[in-house]
């Protein structure tokens, strides 16, 4: 029944927002970098993904990102990434907000994506205004250098202790407040400010749907809660087509 309700809501919605987190990418073989999953050479991500770690030892931080980029380069969008891209084709005004930095939504064909935490394939210079794409795997030089001024570049991602880019956050909040339908997939809703977005949507009267194998602070408040993984959700959604 719940799938039937969701299928009725999708074509009726004037603005559908899909918020995704690490859970969707985990099913493409990308570790969540939390808990045991996240350990690399006995370091926790919280020790490496910070401006202070980068200041102290940029080569170590880049070694970890090189390792992550190798994993991500082998990953393919899964059925749920593809389903979300299909929503954009089939229904009006579908926007994706993601906490993931892997670029798998774009690889699946989604075009309206806000990457709240940045993108692992993008770099920015620590000295000048250079920003660009670096898809080299593995990196030939660690740390990589700016093609413009020769200084070290860093991953263009949001690290622990850094604010989200204000333009992206503002846009994400505005979309959440305007959404008729808000779908949350694969996020534990523990990291602010992204965790507040579905609650903003709820307050403004959106129909809120959650897909998660575990209960989250949203689960009992959502109009529909699919307690399952992202790929299982996509397969069941497609099974019940027609």
UniProtKB/Swiss-Prot annotation:
Question: Its GO CC terms?
Answer: cytoplasm
What are the binding positions for substrate in this chain?
Answer: 65, 68
* Cofactor field: Zn(2+)
Protein name in UniProt: NAD-dependent protein deacylase 1
Q: Tell me the protein family, please.
A: Belongs to the sirtuin family. Class III subfamily.
UniProt keyword Transport present = no
Q: Reaction(s) catalyzed by this protein?
A: N(6)-acetyl-L-lysyl-[protein] + NAD(+) + H2O = 2''-O-acetyl-ADP-D-ribose + nicotinamide + L-lysyl-[protein]; N(6)-succinyl-L-lysyl-[protein] + NAD(+) + H2O = 2''-O-succinyl-ADP-D-ribose + nicotinamide + L-lysyl-[protein]
Principal place where this protein is found? Answer: cytoplasm
Q: Which SUPFAM superfamilies match?
A: DHS-like NAD/FAD-binding domain (SSF52467)
Task: Tell me the CDD domains matching this sequence.
Answer: SIRT5_Af1_CobB
Q: For this protein, what does the record note about how its cofactor is bound? A: Binds 1 zinc ion per subunit.
- The gene coding this protein: cobB1
Report the source organism: Caldanaerobacter subterraneus subsp. tengcongensis (strain DSM 15242 / JCM 11007 / NBRC 100824 / MB4) (Thermoanaerobacter tengcongensis)
UniProt note: domains: 2 residues (Tyr-65 and Arg-68) present in a large hydrophobic pocket are probably involved in substrate specificity. They are important for desuccinylation activity, but dispensable for deacetylation activity.
Show where the Deacetylase sirtuin-type domain sits.
1-242
Q: Name one Pfam family in it.
A: SIR2
* Molecular function GO labels: histone deacetylase activity, NAD-dependent; NAD+ binding; protein-malonyllysine demalonylase activity; protein-succinyllysine desuccinylase activity; zinc ion binding
Residue numbers annotated as active site: 117
Q: Where in the cell is it found?
A: Cytoplasm
